[in-house]
Amino acid sequence: MPGPCPYWSGPAPVNRLSNLGYVILRYDELVRVRIKKLIFVLIAAYVLIIARLFYIQVIRAPFYREKARELTVRKIALPARRGTIYDRDGQKLAVTIDACDIYVQPVKIKDKEEVATQLSQILGCSRTQLLDTLKSDKKFTYVARRADIWIGDAVTRAKIFGTGSIRTTKRVYPGGTLAAHIVGFTNVDGKGIEGLERVYDKQLRGTDGYVVAEVDARGKIIPGTRRDRVEPINGGDIVLTIDSTLQRSLEHELEKSYKAHSAAGATAIMMEPKTGEILALANMPTFDPNNAKNSSAASRRDRAVTDLYEPGSTLKAMTVCAGLEAKAVTPTDIFYCNASKGIGRRTIRCSLHPPFMAGHGACNVAKILTYSCNIGAADIGFKLGGERLYKFEQAFGFYEKPDSGLPGEVRGWHDNWRDWADIRLANIAFGQGIAVTPMQMAKAYSAIANGGLIMKPYVVKEIRKPDGKPEQQFMPTVVRRVMSESTSAMVSEMLQGVVSEG
């Protein structure tokens, strides 16, 4: 065996086999450590998952059950049916019929162009407007409200993804413009906005019910999942004092006069003097409550109770009543009309027309009414004096609301009688410088025809429960006595002369 190389001067040789074994042992140990760590991590993760599941399924179970219930269980409204409005003879003036709302869910619709085309054909509306709606990022929106039932059925049959219809009801007015200012109208959600629809909204609308049930992805109730149900209570019905036949005739005649004179507005009222029942009431211009959204505010205004007018010669009858009742004048007293009369620095005049171009001459009280003599009415006013004339006008109801039950009523306008100069007193005696509503004037004239008793005007005769039984009935109400029966009889006879001779 050869010995060490005599020329090697470095360190002694190492036993490499033993070192190799040492390295191999250390690598095995490293693998075992890593495996142990991995197992530990997996166990820890598993424990955390179990803990999280326990937290979610046990500890937080009530919370997530409620969340799930909110997603699948709905409280769905069951709308009450709005009551019907009838005239005094049972003719329907306002009814509720079945309808539907059409909706879309834009975020769910992919082919918006095609859906817009299909829907526009069914709804008969603008494709461009529909497309604008579909391009929005809304989750839900209506594209038609209170549409006819057949439209909803057509949408359902089309099975267009992201669209649908909801059954509902809508208000319809069979007579169109008939008694529109009395009946009023509702908004798209069935809430009374004007007229008696507004005044009696609570009685008409009833109380909505509801059903609690699970729904599917399209919002439809899953059969057999109903948990609770409360039935709706339908609204009550209202019976008016209005006679539709008289109402239609009054509207027709008023419209002819309104157009013939190119008037800015016109009003007519028919009132039963002995009871205060309003049999007919019309205004021009008018509107169709079936299409109220396209009407003007002027056409919807109930001028009969909201507008003040200078009554003019129509007030002379009240001046005559006051003079006779206060015994300031007698039926046989004579007054002279020379066409004009100086009062201080002012002059009042009568309207001159054949055969009275020079004035009305000698007039008794009846002739003052027959010829509508301003000077004669002023002279009666002077005999009464400001205080008594004012108190009679107050008794006739000119300075209080008529309380007819119609919305928007106002009081008449006047100034303090203590401030009336002679010319002011004269003007008021023949109907100038004072403002009243047509309803107040109708109420006052009814007192003359009713033996001197003023009746409370009213338009609602009865409110009925949903089953048709009476809930509330409105009866004639005496407000006060304004004059004696004898004065009433005298003036009533005088007023006949206004028609036959005036």
Outline where the language-model segments fall.
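Intrinsic structural disorder/low-complexity segments
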Residues: S9-G10, K443
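Beta-lactam-recognizing serine transpeptidase/beta-lactamase-like catalytic domain environment
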Residues: N15-V23, A94, V215-R227, A268-S313, ...
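Periplasmic/cell-envelope proteins involved in peptidoglycan metabolism and beta-lactam response
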Residues: P6-W8, V14-A292, L308, E387-Y399
